[in-house]
Amino acid sequence: CNEGGHFAQMLALKDLFAKYDSVVLTDNERANYNIPALKNVKAIEYAMSFANKRKELTKNKDKKMTHASYLGSYFGLTKECYAACKKYRPKVIISTGSNIAVPLCFIAKWMGAKFVYIETRAKVYNKTISGKIVERFADKIIVQWPEMVEVYMGRAEYYGTLV
């Protein structure tokens, strides 16, 4: 999960964490402060290449992210995700979205794991870019607004909001 709202939504899954041994893969450097509240988290892995590139661009407003640098940092993110998945061999990967969701979806499919995508609560009437990409491959899509079930043409399930 990414930092901000995506991370907060992941933390809202605390009852699920209590039932299963889990590994958290995030680009949120502050995860160490919040993860101890979750039970059964065996490890925290960081996929920082994409987040670091974003921070670099935020600090230097004159610099723009070129397609090549974007793809390069995304390739780095994919390598980090693959390394974590290879190390822990998950049976199920749950993603609360954003940049990390796409590589995790394809890695899950390649490794034979189930992939559950939780669309962000911020989207009420249309899909995120990540949602558009992973929807054909995800084993389950969970949305946080009833209207989004129709947006995903019945392929998504609604259980309410996480936060």
Language-model features and meaning:
Residues 82-92, 102-116, 132-133:
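Glycosyltransferases and closely related glycan-assembly transferases
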Residues 63-91:
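An amphipathic, basic-hydrophobic alpha-helix
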Residues 96-100:
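Short His-centered aromatic/hydrophobic patch
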Residues 1, 21-73, 147, 159:
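Conserved nucleotide-sugar phosphate-binding/catalytic loop shared by glycosyltransferases and other
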